[in-house]
Amino acid sequence: MLARPPTASILLRSPFSCLPARRLSLSSAPPSAFFSCRLSTAATRPPPTAQRALLYVPGSNPKQLKKCLGGGLAQSQPDALILDLEDSVRAEKKGEARRNVLDALQATPDCPSQKFVRINSKQLGLDDLEVLLTTPHLEGLVLPKVHSAADVQLVDRFIEEHGLRETKDKLRIVASIESPLALLNLREIATSSTRISSLLFAAEDFCASSGLIRTPSRREMLFARSSVVTAAKAFGLKAVDLVCVQYKGDEALGVLEDEAREGRELGFDGKQAIHPAQVNVIQAAFTPSPAAIERALAILSQYEAARSSGAGAYGLENADGSSSMIDAPMLLQAEGTLAQARAAGVDV
């Protein structure tokens, strides 16, 4: 078990701190000190970028690939695209889809979205990689049916042996959590490779393999979703929430908005999308609101005043005239809010 270094706060222990084993007071440490480090397993990972909406695009549809990769979604362009070679592609179309995806990646190097490909599992996935690793325009992979560290390490070794020298160290891996076994092995999956950047919760597969009955409340998946978030945050990874299978009409978008808000409250960084109509709703839900940004800025501003007086905690006046005590954990939350806003392109 990894030991957690002591916190830099005089008030509470912080699970985010990687500072040396000494005590500091809020009056001697800048706010950024509390967010400056991650666990050593994340030391060589690429810098974080927003992954609010991750939109699946069938690899068997060249027209959709061209539109999505070419920036043709206009105001609905997601943070990330997942070009799919797995569930959305019939068995007899796998080879054709593989070629479609490679051609699309080669033709659109300036795509405004991050470019991931969901490969198949087992040998078929290695066949996918043989083709995909020939292009420098692939940014990451979504690995389906990850049950243990071995599933990630197989792909990791293949990338190391066959990837292009100039790009293989930049490739990110998103591990799809789809089974009870994967849930039990979250720790080893999260630390299986320095290429791991995110854990993704695949709700339909998880319910099918667990015998869970899907309900509108989603309460049957609360433990699994929370476990994925906890593991991701423990090791400096992003957590991606489930797909909302409804996308047509106002009622469907209302369900999506509720799901996305709930996912954000649970700690997820983003959510999978299966239709461009879902993108804006998702990205709005995972972007800090103007009020949240304003409050975060006020907390950091008040921090400077408290630091000069040597106070470890201080009060902040709320919009309704009441006051809230602000201490180290809330300072961390404020830093996190501003980091999320900047990653989403908000000028803070």
Mark where each language-model region is.
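Expand to "…catalyze enediolate/carbanion chemistry for C-C bond making/breaking, isomerization
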Residues: 2-348
